[in-house]
Curated annotation (Swiss-Prot):
The lineage of its organism: Bacteria, Bacillati, Bacillota, Bacilli, Bacillales. This is Adenylosuccinate lyase. It comes from Staphylococcus haemolyticus (strain JCSC1435). Homodimer and homotetramer. Residues from neighboring subunits contribute catalytic and substrate-binding residues to each active site. One of its GO terms (cellular component) is cytosol. N(6)-(1,2-dicarboxyethyl)-AMP binds at residues 4-5, 67-69, 93-94, 212, 263, 268-270, 276, 307-311. Belongs to the lyase 1 family. Adenylosuccinate lyase subfamily. It catalyses: N(6)-(1,2-dicarboxyethyl)-AMP = fumarate + AMP; (2S)-2-[5-amino-1-(5-phospho-beta-D-ribosyl)imidazole-4-carboxamido]succinate = 5-amino-1-(5-phospho-beta-D-ribosyl)imidazole-4-carboxamide + fumarate. GO terms for molecular function: (S)-2-(5-amino-1-(5-phospho-D-ribosyl)imidazole-4-carboxamido) succinate lyase (fumarate-forming) activity; N6-(1,2-dicarboxyethyl)AMP AMP-lyase (fumarate-forming) activity. The keyword Zinc-finger does not apply. The keyword Lyase applies. Pathway: Purine metabolism; AMP biosynthesis via de novo pathway; AMP from IMP: step 2/2; Purine metabolism; IMP biosynthesis via de novo pathway; 5-amino-1-(5-phospho-D-ribosyl)imidazole-4-carboxamide from 5-amino-1-(5-phospho-D-ribosyl)imidazole-4-carboxylate: step 2/2. Its EC number is 4.3.2.2. InterPro entries: AdenyloSucc_lyase_C, Fumarase/histidase_N, Fumarate_lyase_CS, Fumarate_lyase_fam, Fumarate_lyase_N, L-Aspartase-like, Pur_lyase. PANTHER family: ADENYLOSUCCINATE LYASE (PTHR43172:SF1).
């Protein structure tokens, strides 16, 4: 991922240095496990643990000759050791190291992402509670429907991110898995105890069955889950973009002193952060196809997935980490124009209360079809003439003979739409 959309902590996880360090840790743990089984002298393992060092530049120099990164790595590490170097990579195949270390690196990335999600959820919780009863216009098909509250909108985002967190925790169990089962997964030259020891010490699980590789359905599920998190962010970002339109202006991204919105138009205050999140989400989601196409490897392995994953996994995790942090800050600092929200409710001449009038007529004994056919023409006339809907209703004796002034007052009371907000919040776990 380019530096522009990378945060240092996450980017450092995907450096060559950290990758080789993870490989080295797997190699050393394997030696320790062999030693526990009495196969490698403990003194040799101690020397390996103390003296083995990673030199990325040297490993890459060797790779120019070997054309094999793991062989180059093991030879570079061996250069830092004495006779004990013969135990490095003992009984292992390259992917025992690469796949297990990759899962360990992904685990490091996951710990950051999980904290990112939890922080965003906390901000959404605060926003939901702060604007619990702030009335605003609910829209369906982009058209005014009925009032809701900005707090309910935030509660919706909150519950969606809680689901994302649950899914993320589930996929962590699938992806944070190692394998050290040899060339075709049969443990022909390495006992299962080695795998168990290494994975236990890395804090990851073991694959119950593997080939030379971990199966890539795990990685496809992982990428799809991260893409769904990103897509939720895009959904929220698009809502902010729509609510910041000049004609609506119910919210606005924070605009810093000295910030510029346009090189040509000095007045511009654009939702560039939310637009940025929209674009990043597209990039992340685009990797789903790559992840799924990595699943059908040949027989017990090929490396067609390798080149794709070297690009895909850093890109997706780094981009999502960036997006989560940036969008959390956007929502946290969001300006909310409560007066505009209330004013927008009145822009459609009271038409948004048409269902309340319809239901009131039905409750007083009118057949639904008759009630609908009496209310709709008044609604259409209000649309076309910009006449207040209630004014037209009050001129129709077939309606006023059924509904009293007090009953009409209740029909046109926007506060009615707050009646179940407490229930919604309770169901969302936002008490």
């Amino acid at each position: 991922m380019i530096d522009r959309y990378s945060r240092e902590e996450m980017a450092n996880i995907w450096t060559d240095q950290n990758r080789y360090e993870a490989w080295l840790e797997v190699e050393i743990l394997a030696c320790e496990a062999w030693s526990e089984l009495g196969h490698i002298p403990k003194e040799d393992v101690k020397k390996i643990r103390q003296n083995a060092k990673v030199d990325v530049k040297r490993a890459q120099e060797i790779e120019q000759e070997t054309r094999h990164d793991v062989v180059a790595f093991t030879r570079q590490v061996s250069e830092t050791l004495g006779d004990e170097r013969k135990w490095v990579h003992y009984g292992l195949t390259s992917t025992d190291v690469v796949d297990t270390a990759l899962s360990y690196v992904i685990k490091q990335a996951n710990e950051i992402i999980e904290k990112d999600i939890e922080r965003f959820i906390k901000v959404l919780e605060e926003k939901a509670k702060n604007y619990k009863y702030t009335l605003m216009m609910g829209r369906t098909h982009g058209v005014h429907a009925e009032p809701t509250t900005f707090g309910v909108k935030m509660a919706l985002w909150y519950t969606e991110m809680k689901r994302n967190l649950k899914r993320f925790k589930e996929v962590r169990k699938e992806i944070e898995v190692g394998k050290m089962s040899g060339a075709v997964g049969t443990f022909a030259n390495i006992p299962p105890e080695i795998e168990q020891y290494v994975c236990d010490h890395l804090g990851i699980d073991t694959a119950s069955v593997s080939t030379q590789t971990l199966q890539r359905d795990r990685h496809a599920y992982y990428i799809a889950t991260l893409a769904l998190v990103a897509t939720s962010l895009e959904k929220f970002a698009v809502e902010i973009r729509n609510l910041q339109k000049t004609e609506t202006r119910e919210v606005e991204e924070a605009f810093a002193k000295g910030q510029k919105g346009s090189s040509a138009m000095p007045h511009k205050r654009n939702p560039i952060g939310s637009e940025n999140i929209t674009g990043i989400s597209r990039v992340i989601r685009g990797y789903i196809t790559t992840a799924y196409e990595n699943v059908p490897l040949w027989h017990e392995r090929d490396i067609s997935h390798s080149s794709a994953e070297r690009i895909m996994l850093p890109d997706v995790t780094i981009a999502l980490d960036y997006a989560l942090n940036r969008f959390t800050n956007i929502v946290d600092r969001l300006t909310v124009f409560e007066d505009n929200m209330r004013n927008n409710i009145d822009k459609t001449f009271g038409l948004i209360f048409s269902q309340r009038v319809l239901l009131a007529l039905i409750n007083k004994g009118m057949v639904r079809e008759e009630a609908y056919d009496r209310v709709q023409p008044k609604a259409m006339e209000s649309w076309e003439t910009k006449t207040p809907f209630r004014q037209l209703i009050e001129k129709d004796e077939s309606i006023t003979n059924v509904l009293s002034k007090e009953e009409l007052d209740e029909c046109f009371n926007p506060e009615h739409h707050l009646n179940q907000v407490d229930t919604i919040f309770k169901r969302a776990g936002l008490e």
